[in-house]
Amino acid sequence: MKKNQDYIVTIEDLSVEGEGIGKISEGELGNENGFPLFIKDTVIGDVAKVRVIKVKKNYGYGRLMEIITPSPNRVKPLCPVARQCGGCTLQCMTYEEQLKFKRRKVENNLRRIGGLKDIEVPMTLGMEKPWRYRNKAQVPFGFDKEGICAGFYAG
């Protein structure tokens, strides 16, 4: 696998950060289970054309180029710059799926980190109006030619 190659993948799962996980199943990759790629802005069930942007030993990262077949759980994000800013990582997913994702994340953490094997987390309580409530911002700081700067990354 090389950087800048395009592949068609089906998104099978989500990372803890909400990135879609699709596997490239090519014999030459030497991984019979498929080589996992983490792809922002994808939803479980999407069939997507992705471009490899970073390759590690056992996994890689891809950039979404095109949704070929959208998941039934895919919606158009309300925020017009959702893909560019990266602040609303789950906005392309139905709200019901977002709640399921959050529940699975808590269950997995309690099992994996907390060592609680037989834990069952109740369904996540949703909101009547689940939009425009953002209460967290991560603003990176850096330096440019004029000195210290702060802002958001545009993916």
Model-predicted segments: where are they?
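Non-catalytic accessory regions of SAM-dependent methyltransferases
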Residues: 1-155
